Structure formats: C-alpha cells, structure tokens
Amino acid sequence: MDPYRVRPSSAHDSPFFTTNSGAPVWNNNSSLTVGTRGPILLEDYHLLEKLANFDRERIPERVVHARGASAKGFFEVTHDITQLTSADFLRGPGVQTPVIVRFSTVIHERGSPETLRDPRGFAVKFYTREGNFDLVGNNFPVFFVRDGMKFPDMVHALKPNPKSHIQENWRILDFFSHHPESLHMFSFLFDDLGIPQDYRHMEGAGVNTYMLINKAGKAHYVKFHWKPTCGIKCLSDEEAIRVGGANHSHATKDLYDSIAAGNYPQWNLFVQVMDPAHEDKFDFDPLDVTKIWPEDILPLQPVGRLVLNKNIDNFFNENEQIAFCPALVVPGIHYSDDKLLQTRIFSYADSQRHRLGPNYLQLPVNAPKCAHHNNHHDGFMNFMHRDEEVNYFPSRLDPVRHAEKYPTTPIVCSGNREKCFIGKENNFKQPGERYRSWDSDRQERFVKRFVEALSEPRVTHEIRSIWISYWSQADKSLGQKLATRLNVRPNF
C-alpha cells in the first residue's frame, strides 16, 4: 500500500474517531480512571495526546498584520504590457493566474476590532507558471518611514505600551516627531480614509517601488495600484464605534458573505512607470516610500483585474499559515533600491521562519503550483516526499540543469559605504497638497482628529510645538488651526 495515498488530508478520512496515529478510539467522552471516581491514569494516551495537541494549537502571532481575512480567486490580464515586462503571467490579455489575497489591519492583535483607525494590509499571492509572486502592500500608497532601520522602533511606538499594554498617542507622536517624513502617511491615516468600511471597498497599493524588465533587458521603475470596482467607502468615527460595537469581525464577515452570495469583489490593477533615466527630473526621490508619484505626469496604466470568487476552506491553514514575502518575485519583475523594500526582503521571510518553521514554503497555501526543484531539504516539519540520491549540484548523474537565463538589467553600484539620509527629502510638499485638495468639511474632520491626538495629557508642549511646526510647513493655515485649538503659539 502506498502510505502517501492516504495521508491525512482531511479530518473525515475515517468513519470513526482515531488517535493521530490512526488507532481507533472507542470512547472520546471519558478519561481512564481507577474506578468510577478514582484518579486519572497516565496510560490514557488518547487523553494526553488530546490535551497536548490542544496546548499547541496556537502559533506565534504575526508581529504586524495579525488580524486578517483571506479569499481566493484569479487575476486576469486585460491590457498588453509586454513592452514593459517579460513576466510570464502578464504575457497577454486573457491570461489568468490563480491568486489568494489576505486583507488585514496592521498594528492591532488577532481578534481586535476591524473598525480601528489603522492602515490595512492588501497582500496578493500570484501562483504563476514561473513561481509565486507576492505583491505585499497596504491600502495607502505611502508609508511612515523611508528606511527599514527605523521599522522595529516604529512598530514598538505604534504597539501598546509595554508596561500597560495600552496603545497611547503620546508614544506615537513622540516617536514620529523625530521623523517628519511620516506627515504624508498621517495625512492618509487621520483622513476619512483612515477607517475603511470593509475590505471590498478599499484601494490597495504595492507601496514600494519595484522594477519591470522587458525581454530586451530594459528596466522601468514601477508602482502598483489596486482600484475597487465597487468604489471606496469609509466609516466615520461615529459609525466605526457603532459597527465595531455590534460586530468586531464585520469586515471579515462582509468579505465571506459577499463571496458566498456570488457578489464577487473585484479590483483593477494599474501601474505607474518611470524611466530611471528621468528620476532626477522630480523634486522627490522615486525610491522614497513616503512619496506618491504624480498621476498627471506618470499616469495610471491599466493591466488587469483581480476577482475573488472562492472563500478559503480553512481559516488556520489559509489565513494564519499563509506567508507573504516581498522577496518572492518572478522573471520580469525585480526589486529597486528602495531602502524599505530592501529590508522587507529579509525581514518578512525571517518572520515566517520564526512563526511557521524553516519549511513554511512547503505548506500547501505557500507552495508554488508549478514544478520546482532544489537541494533544500530536511529541517523541522519537512514533509516533502523525496527519494533522490543526489542532493548536490552539479552532478553528472542528475539531469537537472540551470534554467535559461532570463532578461536582467545591468546595474552599476559605486560610491562610499555610508549611512545617510536621502538627498531629496521634501517632507512637507505632498502632505500639504493633499490637505489643500480636500473640501472644508474634510479638512475640519482631519484637524479635529489631530487636535484630539495632540491633546492627550502626556503629549508634552515640546512635542505639540514640533507637530504644529511640521504641519505649518505643509500648510500654514493648517498649522494655525492646530495652534489656535491647542493654545500653542506657532513658531513659523
């Protein structure tokens, strides 16, 4: 008998209860005791196994994006962009690729309300014929910091106080008072967009700058954007309190129920592309993740559509164990020198190895659907069946060979080794432009939210003054409004 034919792929392979090793269980209701009321015997292995399994059901929580919901579907190319990339899954209109998408809140714990003011994760795993491509982004097109060196401290500041386990504005405002590049992100977070109505009615963005490489080896910088076909809807502060009080999993339920009812969520994928030779023409660094690219100069180009038409089969297997990593790219798509992206390449995979073990890519939800071969083997929880005798490369006894070289672009690296800030920070222009693009009511709601945050008792006068100075440099009238309501003399 082939033991792999009956591997435990389902909880219902047997018509009766068994132990993990397959032995029949004739009583799953009572412990083995000495007499009717005597002590439990250690030889009740089924009881011990049951308790031991229960004690180990939970795995380490994601340090960020712990609260999430997943769904499956497909991505279909609608527009030809082969002049930009040689990626096989983008080879022409009509090509479909299976995907799984995970939406999430960023900072708060697993089980926290989905109505909190927090960025939302928007991560897509494409199961392509050339391996998995993970586009791991958020609902906002920018980020808090531009250098991954600051990421651990940033998360610590946004997370609850380690003493009280309470998220507090004074910690957040203190940390980011040292990082004026965060203003642009706060112009999204404290805006009406800060609390999406649900996952179906929010945008997505790749956030980082990647590179598209065509068959000739020509490279372009690229930004990815997801636009929901059903429009953007958000919750007001009052609506968030009401909705969250009624159901703390409202967005997960909305996603699940919509798909179950055949109301499949859809997004259109757009790209912005920039010739690296033109990057010096802008007053910002295109590799700065705190900046958007102006659409009037670098317009959105349509690529395809994302359709989620199937709910996941098991929440733990396909939501908790799913592992995304920006390092997973395919030929035709590559990393830029975006400092945040460069650090994410390591950090995400390292986090998954901690959460799920070194063989996390063997889990069905993470494994590629195409043929794959390498000499990575053994390690904890390695369940891939392998019977080869040659586990080294190269070998005259193993026909495996290198893949054909795919197009790459030559990149010349030169300069001194140094730790420094980027040349064109320009921290205040874009958040100011964004604020001025709103109507007066929307501006007022933003001011009210930021005044409330700055009014927390432990926010010092110095921190308030710094933030007023920052916002004044973005927009003088905004700084004046904050100063007046906080009774702080502005230092223009």
Swiss-Prot record:
Keyword Hydrolase in record: no
Gene3D superfamilies for this protein: Catalase core domain (2.40.180.10)
GO MF: catalase activity; cobalt ion binding; heme binding
InterPro entries per record: Catalase, Catalase_AS, Catalase_clade1/3, Catalase_core, Catalase_haem_BS, Catalase_immune_responsive, Catalase_sf
EC number: 1.11.1.6
Keyword Transmembrane assigned: no
Compartment(s): Cytoplasm
Cofactor(s) recorded in Swiss-Prot or TrEMBL: heme
SMART domains: Catalase (SM01060)
Induction: By hydrogen peroxide. By abscisic acid (ABA), drought, and salt stress through the MKK1-MPK6 mediation.
Catalytic activity: 2 H2O2 = O2 + 2 H2O
Subunit structure: Homotetramer and heterotetramer. At least six or seven isozymes are produced from a mixture of 3 gene products. Interacts with NCA1. Interacts with LSD1.
Similarity comment: family membership: Belongs to the catalase family.
Function: Occurs in almost all aerobically respiring organisms and serves to protect cells from the toxic effects of hydrogen peroxide.
UniProt name for this protein: Catalase-1
Biological source species: Arabidopsis thaliana
